[in-house]
Amino acid sequence: MSARPPRDRGAWSAEDAERYVLSLELFGMNFGLERMRRLMTALEHPQRRFGSIHVVGTNGKSSTTRMTAAILERHGMRTGAYLSPHLSHFCERIRVGEADIAPSAFAAAVQRAAHAAELVDTAARGPDRVTQFEVLTAAAYSELAARDVEVAVVEAGLGGRYDATNVIPSKVQILTSVGLEHTRWLGPTVADIAREKLAVVQPGGVLVLGPGLHRDADAEARAVAERSGARIVRAPADPGVAVGPLGVFQRRNFAVARAAAEAYLGTLDDAKVAAAAAQVQIPGRLQVVAREPLTLLDGAHNPEGIAALAESLPEITGGRRTVAVVSILDDKDAAGMLATLLPACDAMIVTSSQNPRALPPPTLASLTGQLGGPPAEIVRDPRAALERARTLAGPDGVVLATGSIYLVADLLRTSPSRLRASIL
């Protein structure tokens, strides 16, 4: 059973809020949106007080969300964004004007959502309770409404149809890409997964499709658009401007963001688009954290994401010795990821992360050997693994830590968390 919010304690601290969120169940007993709808009712429907763009897809959601918000912000709109997961702190999930909200604002938003959740749970029949992601999403919508944002760019968590974010009357929906992920919940085929994600499409909405979409996903998109009366916009692969974040995939993501911003706002100012492209920051995606050797963190966590990463590496490494630090969760296609990553690396160190679903490093090392790669070195502590990789690469080499967003989070965290990490 989820924890009840503390009573008679006045305003919560950020630590109070984080402890409460982490006490909640990850999944409800009933799969659906009923709890979330009741939360919105208890909070007086904050999600209806701003315009919205809904971002779904297998890869590229967070980057596209940030990029779309950056373009709209530079066109004079007061923007908000909701993202998941976070890297260092829950505050990163809720952004206003391209800045994370303050810890005090996060605490107040969660406190509002917690009291709404208590009302919903008390009125519920049976043991079903509001979940962690539902409270976070409710807190985000509450805070975005309280901050008077004009438009929020909202990243879905899992799928679309029954994702807690799917209570917004979005004007524009974005499908970035579709690959085989979360098949236990979304279905075994690309078409099944696309169908679940595309359930966010609104009647008369505008559906922006990422370039290179799988043909089965494209067919589903056309069918959904026809049924809902939505207009399809196909984003090009080239954004038409220089993009600051590293990676070929980020150029594609910015092209999608540009198409979405135009669908929402109308004709865009090229200079403002170029400024957004140059200035937007994307943590955890080919993020440079050190030089000599060049050290990069990237949260690619499935074969498609690793393929996009591998495509981008040659223009970044320039043939320099590259050492990878890898951790992968146990529900991912580790073999598919490693098979794509190994040819791009000269050496590999396998490690773990705080996420309890991280594969044991010996398992990863064995799998690397089975795939014909060089012997993988095992260093269980992520920070020690990164330092070992930097030594192996030498000052002129490249170090890449990837395979899990949770590995990236561990490496970016400035100090060990006193609370257990969220696995959402």
How does the language model describe each region?
Residues 1-59, 63-78, 87-89, 208-209:
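N-terminal leader/targeting and accessory segments in enzymes
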Residues 9, 27, 33-48, 74-168, ...:
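ATP-dependent carboxylate-amine ligase catalytic core
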Residues 68, 161-171, 412-414:
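Short Gly/Thr/Asp-enriched flexible loops that form oxyanion-binding sites at enzyme active sites
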Residues 120-124, 135, 147-155, 170-271:
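Acidic, Mg2+-coordinating active-site environments of NTP-dependent enzymes
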Residues 148-150, 319, 394-396:
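Short, high-confidence coil segments that cap the C-terminus of an alpha-helix
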Residues 151-154, 163-174, 178-179, 192, ...:
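Nucleotide phosphate-binding/pyrophosphate-handling subdomain across enzymes
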Residues 212-233, 262, 294-295, 338-398:
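C-terminal helical cap/extension that packs against the catalytic core
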Residues 404:
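Active-site-proximal loop/hinge segments that shape catalytic or ion-binding/gating pockets
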